């Protein structure tokens, strides 16, 4: 093959690669548009559905500040705050899952499975029982989550999937035992509310706007550090070869995961499997592990998933309300088992 033939072959291969990348990028944009449409549809369904007997026309009027006072109270004091809390908490848990999976280099890492949510719950409950202020409860939850993720990392480091999951089970069990002890000594007047909160309840969100704002800010920060996350997820050898300060980044990820999980637990209790399901779904749908896409898309999908679970929790057993954590466990447990079997195969 002459020089002209070689140049022609290189040109053809290059054009094929450009076309493939263009088609892939086009598919990803379409996927993002579909994801945003799905999120908008769930928002609309969540705002218009419930057991209060409010029609769609009344709901829209109430959101616009018109209509009767009862409808406005239901929309502005119940449905809208729950929707905001669902998207905020779901986004936080999904992003925590993304960061944990990058930290442990394991697709089965999740705040709930590894006991990080349990650690945050222990810290928050302990602060509540001792009469701490809101800032004290938040700080205790972050410390509890940070302690749990640090213990899991130290015990499961380099041990593979089985060791990671076993360590998570042990930490989660220990946190569950501590929660039981704290509930046993808690004031009986607050016991029912604490139990329902622990099962996952968006109705207890103290400030739904704060969780949503935290999720948006966290997604923006994740975009800024997406490239180091990609390098860290590729392994220590790759990270050291490009001069990445591994221990600094690990410490930062510890703190970030603990903070995200703690904010979610404070607002909604222990809700599981959002951080496990969401990153997997995004990677499969977009056929990429690039955190520049996975992190922000996971925040949107995580919020959508939890908003859907909350919609089911409010409407399936109407007029009774189910814990949103129970809905997520019923959906997430079979998916977790399927992923575990797939990884073992």
Locate each region found by the language model:
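Alpha-helical transmembrane segments in inner-membrane proteins
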Residues: 3-345
């Amino acid at each position: 093959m002459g020089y002209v033939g070689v140049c022609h072959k290189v040109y053809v291969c290059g054009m094929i690669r450009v076309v493939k990348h263009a088609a892939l990028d086009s598919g990803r944009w379409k996927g993002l548009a579909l994801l945003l449409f799905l999120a908008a549809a769930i928002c609309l369904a969540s705002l218009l559905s419930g057991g209060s007997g409010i029609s769609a026309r009344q709901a829209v009027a109430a959101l616009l500040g018109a209509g009767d006072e009862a409808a406005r109270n239901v929309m502005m004091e119940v449905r809208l705050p729950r929707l905001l809390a669902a998207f905020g908490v779901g986004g936080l848990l999904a992003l925590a899952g993304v960061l944990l999976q990058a930290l442990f280099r394991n697709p089965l890492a999740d705040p709930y499975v590894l006991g990080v949510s349990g650690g945050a719950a222990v810290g928050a409950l302990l602060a509540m029982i001792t009469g701490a202020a809101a800032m004290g409860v938040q700080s205790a939850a972050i410390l509890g989550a940070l302690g749990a993720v640090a213990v899991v990392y130290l015990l499961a480091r380099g041990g593979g999937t089985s060791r990671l999951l076993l360590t998570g089970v042990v930490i989660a069990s220990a946190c569950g035992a501590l929660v039981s002890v704290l509930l046993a000594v808690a004031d009986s007047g607050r016991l029912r509310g604490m139990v329902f909160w622990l099962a996952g309840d968006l109705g207890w969100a103290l400030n739904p706007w704060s969780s949503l704002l935290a999720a948006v800010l966290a997604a923006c920060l994740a975009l800024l550090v997406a490239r180091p996350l990609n390098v860290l997820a590729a392994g220590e050898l790759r990270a050291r070869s490009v001069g990445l300060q591994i221990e600094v980044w690990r410490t930062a990820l510890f703190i970030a995961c603990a903070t995200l999980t703690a904010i979610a637990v404070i607002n909604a209790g222990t809700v599981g499997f959002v951080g496990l399901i969401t990153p997997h779904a995004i990677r499969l749908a977009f056929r990429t592990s690039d955190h520049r896409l996975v992190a922000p898309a996971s925040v949107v999908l995580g919020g959508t998933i939890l908003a859907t679970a909350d919609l089911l929790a409010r409407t399936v057993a109407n007029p009774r309300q189910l814990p949103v954590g129970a809905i997520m466990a019923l959906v997430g447990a079979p998916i977790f088992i399927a992923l575990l079997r797939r990884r073992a195969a």
